[in-house]
């Protein structure tokens, strides 16, 4: 089975410049350096808003046809940054991410609950946490604190947005700095290596 949620393809001057947002679009130096958490929050908000009528207020724009417009998306990112403002060490806390995103949602009339998984002990534990959420149309926030894989050498201390999966290929699909990437989950959750990751997912509060 392969499934991919609708992550906005961001358009600027008639050209596609991003699969979701990119922290390099922020105007401030520190925002560009440490704004990945708020980009992931923005991606999750936009995916929810564009796929569910009852969640549309998470991306409050008057014309949904302009949801992929660069200026509109940057405005969402700037708003989310005020909720997820990083400290001098960045924003490396899954509990804080969950709390801040739920606060953003609450301020927009939507009550969410969250679950967090830190340092999954096996590939199976990680996938049992991630895949059911995606199958139920919930994007997943993923924090890479430290990972020894060569493929992830540029991605330590970084948030990405998981938007899909391919069970046959054994890959996760995510938005990373505005790029759509497919990542081998056997590499990502290789228990022979010491890695530090955290995962956050949301759902409607019952």
Task: Go through each PLM region and give its residues.
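Active-site-adjacent structural segments surrounding the nucleophilic cysteine of cysteine proteases
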Residues: 1-94
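Extracellular structured ligand-interaction cores
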Residues: 33, 139, 159
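Short, amphipathic alpha-helical segments
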Residues: 35, 91-95, 120-124, 136, ...
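Short, basic/glycine-rich phosphate-binding loops at helix/coil junctions
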Residues: 74-82, 99-112
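Internal catalytic-core helix/loop-beta-alpha segment
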Residues: 103-136
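Structural recognition of the beta-strand scaffold that forms the well-ordered cores
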Residues: 113-114, 140-143, 173
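Active-site signature of cysteine proteases
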Residues: 123-129, 133-136, 145-206
